[in-house]
UniProtKB/Swiss-Prot annotation:
GO terms for biological process: diaminopimelate biosynthetic process; lysine biosynthetic process via diaminopimelate. CDD domains: LbH_THP_succinylT (cd03350). The lineage of its organism: Bacteria, Pseudomonadati, Pseudomonadota, Gammaproteobacteria, Legionellales. Its EC number is 2.3.1.117. Keywords: Acyltransferase, Amino-acid biosynthesis, Cytoplasm, Diaminopimelate biosynthesis, Lysine biosynthesis, Repeat, Transferase. Pathway: Amino-acid biosynthesis; L-lysine biosynthesis via DAP pathway; LL-2,6-diaminopimelate from (S)-tetrahydrodipicolinate (succinylase route): step 1/3. It comes from Legionella pneumophila subsp. pneumophila (strain Philadelphia 1 / ATCC 33152 / DSM 7513). This is 2,3,4,5-tetrahydropyridine-2,6-dicarboxylate N-succinyltransferase. NCBIfam families: dapD (TIGR00965), PRK11830.1 (NF008808).
Length: 276
């Protein structure tokens, strides 16, 4: 893998002078190897190592090089045609291959090559971009989007119209990460490398970016960029110091342990905050 990484890194440093005509066959093969590895789950743009998320920027560089070097081509989807640099993941998939994958793909769900979809995942009419990693047992509901390089854990439910932000550039930016057993409510947006830790529930219409204040009503603390494990989060507002206005925030209304999260329904967890 090191030689593959070195080849990608060197080419990216010299990307301004590269074209499809000048790129070596070794480089083209390396880019295709990375895209195939992302597609089958061999590679991940981000992974948890010793309890911390590590981002492999060189994989993002390979994707960006593919955009620069590969020409647009016609993609025949049967009901219409597309014109893009990256083919669709399931265009040539046979019945046997679908059965082996264990994935259900409802008509009009779109997945680009280079996104990994694990078994027991259901894709309603939705969009999954290149470099995304979707683990086992995930539901991606209607009109939801999973952006480039986003990382989705096991047994996550991404509700209708929700958006999980993607990131390829700038290279220093981290992907958005939803850890295991999380629920993302309808029309919510989680973007800009925000991490939602395991067993959390995000209510409908919650917007989370790096500049979004996250208010913990239990402790009174304000944080940014990360939802702690087991949090139940709703949309809210915080007043200004002079009381002249209020600004949007996300509110952690409670935190539950894994056993409670498993036993109590999503609706009960969200309704509980209305009694206070």
């Amino acid at each position: 893998m090191n030689s593959l990484q070195d080849l990608i890194e060197q080419a990216f440093e010299n990307r301004q002078n590269l074209s499809l005509d000048t790129a070596s066959s070794d480089l083209i093969n390396a880019i295709n190897e990375v895209l195939s590895g992302l597609d089958n789950g061999q590679f991940r743009v981000a992974e948890k190592i010793n309890g911390e998320w590590t981002v492999h920027q060189w994989l993002k560089k390979a994707v960006l090089l593919s955009f620069k070097l590969f020409p647009n081509q016609i993609i025949d989807a049967g009901f219409c045609k597309f014109y893009d640099k990256i083919p669709l993941k399931y265009t040539d998939c046979s019945n046997e291959q679908f059965q082996q994958s264990g994935v259900r793909v409802v008509p009009h769900a779109m997945v680009r090559r280079g996104a990994y979809i694990a078994k027991n995942t259901v894709l309603m009419p939705s969009y999954v971009n290149i470099g995304a990693y979707i683990d086992e047992g995930v539901m991606v509901d209607t009109w939801a989007t999973v952006g480039s390089c986003a990382q989705i854990g096991k047994n996550v439910h991404i509700s209708g119209g929700a958006g999980i932000g993607g990131v390829l550039e700038p290279l220093q930016a981290n992907p958005t990460i939803i850890e295991d057993n999380c629920f993302i409510g309808a029309r919510s947006e989680i973007v800009e490398g925000v991490i939602v830790e395991k067993n959390s529930v995000i209510s409908m219409g919650v917007f989370l970016g790096q500049s979004t204040k996250i208010y913990n009503r239990i402790t009174g603390e304000v944080s940014y960029g990360r939802i702690p494990a087991g949090s139940v989060v709703v949309a809210g507002n915080l007043p200004s110091h002079d009381g002249s206005h209020s600004l949007y925030c996300a509110v952690i209304v409670k935190q539950v342990d894994e056993k409670t999260r498993a036993k109590v329904s999503i609706n009960d967890l969200l309704r509980a905050n209305q009694d206070d």
